Amino acid sequence: PITKNSANPNYVFRVSAVDEIVDRGMVDYAQNTFKTSKFGLIMVNNPWGESNERGIVAALTAKNMKAVGIEKFEGSDVDVTPQLSRLRAAGADTLFMVGNVGPSAQVVKSLDRMGWKVPVVSHWGPAGGRFTELAGPSARDVHFVQTYSFFGKQSPTGEKVIAALKAKYPDIKGPEDISPAVGVANAYDAMKLTALAIQQAGSTDGDAIREGFYKIGKYDGLIKTYEKPFTPEVHDALTEKDYVWAQFVDNRILPVGMAK
């Protein structure tokens, strides 16, 4: 991870999802939600896909499991039926998907053409754009990771942020207009934590700010309440406990289970 870069001193601090943690979370979520165990991987053929392939394989290995198959697709592919057919033939009962909006939509459309109804657990790629428009009604069947949702009951910080966004941007009428939600939430908490680090440092000197991050105590943030989020060994403020699993419902990203 970029936060574990071997630099000394290390100036990289992060408020976001971490691939290796997401990969473990995908496996846990599939097991707990769908009660399945024969996992197939369908991954975009680029460094992001390769990194998550290694992470998911490692997560499975830690559970004494292995994937029934691993298939890749190009970002420009418009038909992923051959790869999916091999995964179905191998006995996959759940798919782990990593890819951005367009390629992920092609996976869903290919599943539709095959008539294969199979759970799809995804990284957050589908959340970044016009997924429902590109994938069609079956976009709803993809469960993907998020770090925050503006839907549902909000904390006082969440209510304050939504009100501020509505006041500043007239096009924002409600949670469905805040996109991408994770980008807003991650950036909001990251900037607030940075401000606290500068406050602790009493200056804008880089070394002082780095030490200031370690001195942050409690912060009631948007994503969660942070308690000493950073140490010299830990530069990631979020863990798997902070992730939200979501799905598209009528072009809205809702936490799984909230859909009516």
Regions found by a protein language model. Give the residues of each.
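Segments of small-molecule ligand-sensing domains
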Residues: 170-185, 191, 195-255
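Extracytoplasmic ligand/sensor domains, especially the bilobed periplasmic-binding protein
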Residues: 1-69, 117-144, 150-151
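Short acidic active-site motifs
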Residues: 79-83, 103, 130-131
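Periplasmic-binding protein-like
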Residues: 38-43, 91-101, 107, 118-123, ...
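Catalytic-loop motifs flanking and including active-site residues across diverse enzymes
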Residues: 22, 52, 103, 186-190
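Structural motif
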Residues: 22-25, 73-86
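Sec-exported extracytoplasmic/periplasmic mature domains
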Residues: 7, 31-36, 57-65, 85-92, ...
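Extracellular/periplasmic periplasmic-binding protein-like sensory domains
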Residues: 9, 108-188, 199, 247, ...
